[in-house]
Amino acid sequence: MPRPPKCRWVRSEPNVTHFKPVGVPMSMLDEVILTVEELEAIRLKDLEGLEQEECAEMMKVSRPTFFRIINSARQKVADALVNGKAIRVEGGNYRVYDEDQRGHRGMRHRHGQWGRED
């Protein structure tokens, strides 16, 4: 039996959760689902320009785990861009931390859908 996945830490839940090509109705598009932790990995590495080791520390995962998360995220984004698919950000196994409080206070645990607390 596989070990249950550990929660990844993310700074915040995304404000925007859907992206799609202009001029094509959503009903005609295939969709790629990007998890919240995959979006966080892209934010840390590609937007903030942090080293993978720093990103892994911030998300509280090992470097190999971060590498797998960022590779999965990049593959999904590339698929959506090249093949004209919509991107929906949802789900995953993560914790949201307050910028000022990285301890257990100020953290909310999320798994799967928005608003479902464990």
UniProtKB/Swiss-Prot annotation:
Pfam families for the chain: DUF134 (PF02001)
Gene3D superfamilies: Winged helix-like DNA-binding domain superfamily/Winged helix DNA-binding domain (1.10.10.10)
Highest taxon above the source species: Bacteria
InterPro entries: RNA_pol_sigma_r3/r4-like (IPR013324), UPF0251 (IPR002852), WH-like_DNA-bd_sf (IPR036388)
Any coiled-coil regions, as ranges: none
Entry similarity comment: Belongs to the UPF0251 family.
PANTHER family tied to this protein: PTHR37478, UPF0251 PROTEIN TK0562
Name of this chain's protein: UPF0251 protein Teth39_0655
